[in-house]
Amino acid sequence: MSSVNVDFEQAGELKIGQVGIANLRIRTLDVPRLVREMQDRVTRAPKLFGRAAVILDFGGLAQAPDLATAKALLDGLRSAGVLPVALAYGTSEIDLLSQQLGIPLLAKFRAQYETAAVRPPQPPPPPHARAEPAAPVARPAPVRMQRNTVRSGQQLYAENCDLTVLSTVGAGAEVIADGSIHIYGTLRGRALAGAQGNPDARIFCRDFHAELVAIAGHYKVLDDVPMDLRGKAVQVWLEQDQIKIAALD
């Protein structure tokens, strides 16, 4: 079984979301390096990243950038071909920075920075007559089934379940699942498994020509896949935050 795992440290980690917005988690305030990395991404996958909406996440830094650095980063990313549209919610400093930059905070990222409130202890319920527990009923895992071809420009989302596609996913099409994805035809478009952050989700495909595959936001584009895996039956999984692809034959 052959596999590929490209492992190198990046100045910014880009994750693909299920709503067409990418989250750029900033690891360093080296603006020229961040801009070069984004230019490289856009060059290698222009249909995916060209004019893509991007959320900037400064949560990985010891402190928020100053206004001049943040403005330079936004201008550089725009020149690289993407569109910074918001900041990920973080601290009061990030809140102030978003106001100074004139761009919003994205509320959906709030949960990444706040711990859940502790529920106060509840009084014990009154005693009831003991009843025999019902025998557990085995429930099959939910699966969404797609029998027809997913054509260019279409997006198919399997919420809270796996997705099985019996036909082809065409170039420019996108299939997304909160669970795993099984494709029994050709995958030429994009497949995003574990869309709500499940790192154990996998992608299985009989004929692999994907523009992009992603699991829990971590992604790999076709240009990063060795030629000997293209056109093969493969599985895709996530290991130590790195996408791995291996032939099934």
From Swiss-Prot:
Residue numbers spanned by region Disordered: 117-138
- InterPro entries in alphabetical order: CAP/MinC_C, MinC, MinC_C_sf, MinC_N, Septum_form_inhib_MinC_C
Is this entry keyworded Membrane? no
Q: Cross-referenced Gene3D superfamilies, in alphabetical order?
A: 2.160.20.70, 3.30.70.260
Highest taxon, organism lineage: Bacteria
* Keyword terms, alphabetized: Cell cycle, Cell division, Septation
Disulfide bond residue pairs: none
Q: Which biological process annotations from GO are given for this protein?
A: cell morphogenesis; division septum assembly; regulation of cell division; regulation of cell septum assembly
Pfam families (alphabetical): MinC_C, MinC_N
Q: Which HAMAP family match?
A: MinC
Described function: Cell division inhibitor that blocks the formation of polar Z ring septums. Rapidly oscillates between the poles of the cell to destabilize FtsZ filaments that have formed before they mature into polar Z rings. Prevents FtsZ polymerization.
Subunit: Interacts with MinD and FtsZ.
Family named by the database record: Belongs to the MinC family.
Protein name per Swiss-Prot or TrEMBL: Probable septum site-determining protein MinC
The organism named in the record is Xanthomonas campestris pv. campestris (strain 8004)
- Point out the gene that encodes the protein: minC
